[in-house]
Amino acid sequence: LIFVLCCFCGIAQAQPQRPKLVVGIVIDQMRWDYLYRYYARYGEGGFKRMLGEGFSVENCKIPYIPSVTAIGHSSIWTGSVPSIHGIAGNNFMKDGKVVNCTADETVNPVGSDSKAGKMSPRNLWVTTIGDELRLATNNRSKVVGVALKDRASILPAGHHANGAYWFDDKSGKFITSTFYMEKLPEWVNKFNKQKLPNKYLSKKWETLYPIDSYKESTSDDNNYENGIVEGEKAVLPLDLPALYKKYGYKILRNTPFGCNLTFDIAKAAIEGENLGRNTDTDLLTISCSSTDYIGHQVGVNAI
């Protein structure tokens, strides 16, 4: 009996090891079948590793319409649906008028003078995973959200995040609002000073592999696609310096380099906020928005 009791005491005292950092990644407009359609293209350390060592939900239901960015991100990070979390679309009726899901006239931009900074999660009625994590640890856990889209950064990060940062087309910088802070952290200023958008827009967009090897997709030059932006053909290679000169920083959103930039600031956030180096679990939410921007232009079967 003594032996048995000691065993149970040992089990009771053993605490499961908690992760130092949880990273949640949403790839906007990525269909489930892409995991298998492009499987041969994936490296061993990315999607193949997730499929081999992780868990794939292959019989799930989306119980709402439409499945747009704001609703999807809110539902993922709150575990609820529009009738509960309050985000009924990217834009929806509120008090008799159409509003942007994250627009907030009571806050001001931080890091820019653009109206793109007048955003917050006030329209989100419930808490996110990050909010609950902060509450559970008496604010010791850190929660940070990053994305090109404001709503894809703000809604996952939630009400009580340490920061949410999104891309400003006017300045080419990542910004936030006074809902979160009065001035940008030094690590964000340092990141913005690198002017990475200029670097990405200084070269052509070319395919990673020979263009005739993309057997999984429709031919590049076809009649089923809109342009990279309205009036510009989406045929690779694309002259990004010329497009940048004509359309400014917003053209970056419609290229794969928008995802590169998103992961660049995600890595900067890990270093700048010391995420994963605390005694409590931290959370970093990342959304790849460029796949959605270009997906609306060229469809689901493009190279």
Positions of PLM-derived features:
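His/Asp/Glu-rich, glycine-adjacent segments
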Residues: 81, 89-280, 289-296
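Stable alpha-helical elements in mature extracytoplasmic
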Residues: 26, 31, 43-47, 72-73, ...
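Soluble non-cytosolic domains of exported or imported proteins
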Residues: 17, 21, 29, 33, ...
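Bacterial Sec-dependent N-terminal signal peptides
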Residues: 1-17
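Short, structured active-site-proximal loop/turn typified by the sulfatase FGly-forming signature C/S-X-P-X-R
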Residues: 35-84, 142-146
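Beta-strand elements within well-structured catalytic alpha/beta cores of enzymes
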Residues: 19-31, 50, 76, 133, ...
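Signature of Gram-negative outer-membrane beta-barrel scaffolds
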Residues: 297-302
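Loop/turn elements at helix/coil->beta-strand transitions in domains of secreted/extracellular proteins
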Residues: 18-23, 53-57, 84, 138-143, ...
